[in-house]
Structures are given as structure tokens and as C-alpha cells.
């Protein structure tokens, strides 16, 4: 753990292209610089699930793999050091195929399949966050789990939502902060976690790393 003599960091690197994560960091006043993947990096292989892998294990593994890739990127670019933040979000429907991992839809047909699975049911949204405090240490990480209950969706409702384009690029084929909010009856847990970055848990990691932001605290 860091102590009070450790360096303070005025910014972090965000190793994610998610506009929602950028928005959430701005919401709590965290300054960041992008450490986005290169176009040639193989994100699909990192995000591929293993046979019979549980959603919690999957999202934690993928986030740590992203952290390793981000560290390599940082070294290759010879950037000054600051903590590196990575995150990954997935959706799981308990009881369906042993808790099938419902990632980003491949196409409209897959989006329809996922939305029909979630219709009228309660599913889990799991977001893992990893913060690498120094280049020589393992990242500190957490997994936050929330529950989301969907209303019963009609065929027309699903078709219109898919036509909006919003399901694509989002785990579970919906976004809670957009049109997808009209699909949701209730949530239990972290709204920001469902968006892609649980701010309470992430702020605890920032405090540990002594990242400065408006409500930061120092840990002895």
C-alpha cells in the first residue's frame, strides 16, 4: 500500500475508448489522458471468453489482460508515468446456460437474441476495474456487481431499439444512460457501474494511488 510519502498524481491514463467512462471520470473531476489501443491491437482475442467461464472470472481476467496491454503500450510510447486505469463490463443472466456471458452483440440478429433473453427478467451487470499504480507492481482491482430488471419487451419495442443503433458496442445490447433506460423497471447496485465505471469503488482505488481529484483523500 502507498504511504503519505508517495508521489501524488495529478492525472491518470485511461486505457479505454468508452465515451461513457470518459464522461464518468469527468463527473468526479478526475483528469486523464487517453492511452487507447492501436488500430492493429487484437482486442477480440482479449475479450474472447473461455469455455464454462463464469462472468465474474471472465470480466476480471479481461480487465487484467487489458491492463497488461496498456502497460506495454505505455512503455512503447515512452510516456511519463501516471496510474493506468482499465475496465471491462459484461452482462450475465443467472440460470441461463449456467450464467451465459452476454457481451457486445455481433450484429442485429445477435442483439435481438440478447434482448429477448433479457426481456422480463433480472440480469447481472459486472464491471471490473484495475488501476496500475506503478509500472513494477500488479494492478489493484475490484469487481462490482449490480442487478437490472427489464420490462417485458414486445417484438416492436425490440425492433425499434435495434434500429436506433444504440445496442451495438454495449455489453448486453443496451445502454442504461440512453434510450435503453426505457427498457428498465429497476436496478439494484451502482448506476455508474452499469454504465461502465463504478465511481465509488473506482474513487477508492484513486485514493489508494493518491490520484488528486476534488474529493480525494490520503491513505496512510
What are these regions (language model features)?
Residues 85-87, 128-130, 177:
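Short beta-strand segments
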Residues 92-93, 130-134, 184-185:
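Short beta-strand-to-turn element immediately C-terminal to the catalytic PLP-Schiff-base lysine
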Residues 1-83, 93, 97, 207-220:
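N-terminal polybasic phosphate/anion-binding patch
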Residues 108, 113-116, 120, 128-141, ...:
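Anionic-ligand binding region
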Residues 25, 63, 88, 111, ...:
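Residue-level signal for inorganic ion chemistry
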Residues 83, 89-123, 150:
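Active-site-adjacent loop/tail segments of enzyme domains
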Residues 2-30, 121, 136, 145-220:
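GST superfamily/GST-like fold recognition
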